[in-house]
Amino acid sequence: MQFVQNFPFFCILLTLMGAVASSVMSSRMARRTTLFLILADLAMNVSVMIYTFQTGDSYAYKMGHFPAPWGNEIRVGVLETVSLTVFLLVILFSFLGGMRRSEKEIEPTKYNIYCILTDLTMLSLIALVYTNDLFTAYVFIEINTLAAAGLVMMRQHGRALVAGVRYMM
């Protein structure tokens, strides 16, 4: 197994650790950490995409001792890497484009929570694209919907708050 084949797992693990670390950071450090995570995940995913284009093959990365129906497994191929590259580019441009507006509309004491929710949304998208088993897909669909609802409610006024609360009910 080549080292680049470990990058999808590293993307998931790095993003999860970054989301946890952002909870104790200042808003400025959390923003920088989130931007670093997006760029690092994008770079690792592009490396995996180049690898899958060169080999023309897909591979399964088994996490643990059991294969897909009973254990967690990641499947990586050309389709997965291309679609995740598009997702990560959209996340990068959205985060950079909305940075000034989010700084104005979100309280400074809650900006690190915004970064945590962005990290969790990105984490769930990475895991959903790469997963090869239903249990992992279900878990990360739940993480994705809760993080997305939290991102909608971060503005804390108007229709966004009502929509987020309705979803949570």
Enumerate the predicted regions with their spans.
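C-terminal regulatory domains involved in ligand/effector binding and gene-expression control
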Residues: Q5-L16
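Alpha-helical multi-pass transmembrane bundles of energy-transducing inner-membrane proteins
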Residues: L117-L120, S124-M169
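Alpha-helical transmembrane segments of multi-pass membrane proteins
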Residues: L16, T85-V86, L146-A147
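Transmembrane helix-loop-helix hairpins at membrane boundaries of multipass inner-membrane proteins
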Residues: M1-F7, A21-I116
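Juxtamembrane transmembrane-helix termini
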Residues: G18-A21, F93, A147-A149, R155
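Transmembrane alpha-helical core residues of multi-pass small-molecule transporters
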Residues: L14, L37-A40, V90, I141-T145
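Hydrophobic transmembrane-helix microenvironments that flank and shape a buried ionizable site
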Residues: I12, I74-G77, Y130, V139-I141
